């Protein structure tokens, strides 16, 4: 999925839009048309673009911020889609934001706790259980993130179309870029789920062997 995203982004990053808006300008315009008041800034890295609801800031990577390509405008508009979600109080986005703190703890602590619990005698299996619970929160976050990302893309494409920012063929290109990005979230969600099931199987097998 990541390879698909990179190749699709690379393809449409070489095709400029007819309007000539940069990613930064497109993000600002999409957010404005969607009723969101935001600040756009540039950050380092490649495809590190994000929206921070705490300060209403859209951060765009170097390959997006000043680029006038279909890919850049599509990615920038997607982040603006998140700002519109935030401005309109989109419930799944609120749930996702509420999960962020516990997910951060879970992503850091779950695997070390599981490893420690497996090393210790079986009477310390509760440590494994806590680790698996924390990892389960990470998996939940992944699955909550997927519809939020898809909704942000739908909002972005709607504004790009209705606002006349992209024309028909350009809109199709932006849609392909955003769909490729969605596939990476889908792949990450199922990878995390498979890992959770594997951890549950290991924990269950350990208990069974010590009965």
Predicted regions, residues:
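Polar-ligand-bearing catalytic/cofactor-coordination segments
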Residues: 2-106, 140-211
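Post-HExxH zinc-binding segment in Zn-dependent metallohydrolases
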Residues: 99-124
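Hydrophobic alpha-helical segments of integral membrane proteins
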Residues: 114, 121, 135, 192, ...
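Hydrophobic alpha-helical transmembrane segments
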Residues: 123-133
